Amino acid sequence: MNIDETKIEQAITDKTKVIVAMHYAGVACEMDTIMEIAHRHGLKVVEDAAQGVMSSYKGRALGTIGDFGCYSFHETKNYSMGEGGALVINNPAYNERAEILREKARTARNSSAVRSISTHGWTSATAICPVS
């Protein structure tokens, strides 16, 4: 049920920005291949590790290999807390942007982050109402 890494490159277009690797039922995606493809094409990798809690790939916890790791806390996931989730960031350069997203662009704990917001839109990462 995981992404077929042999089909990723043929799906990449000039509009592609990220590769999303969803680890299902604790089975890891082929992350070495995915990371190599992403590097070659200048893409980021987002790991959906909500179903990969406590699982690993070559000794590394799922959700910590790509540029970002995501964990859902929805009631159907391994860690059920009703709603919400967690974001793992492997590059401190994204910390400020993550703070803006966490606050849905309404407020931010860092005042410089608030000043950096210039527009809001449905497809912008700073949308006031997150798309679900």
Name each region found by the language model:
Residues 2, 28, 79:
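Loop/helix-junction capping segments adjacent to catalytic residues or to phosphate/diphosphate-binding pockets
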Residues 5-20, 25-59, 91:
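Catalytic PLP-binding core of fold-type I/II PLP enzymes
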Residues 52-58, 65-132:
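Active-site region of PLP-dependent enzymes
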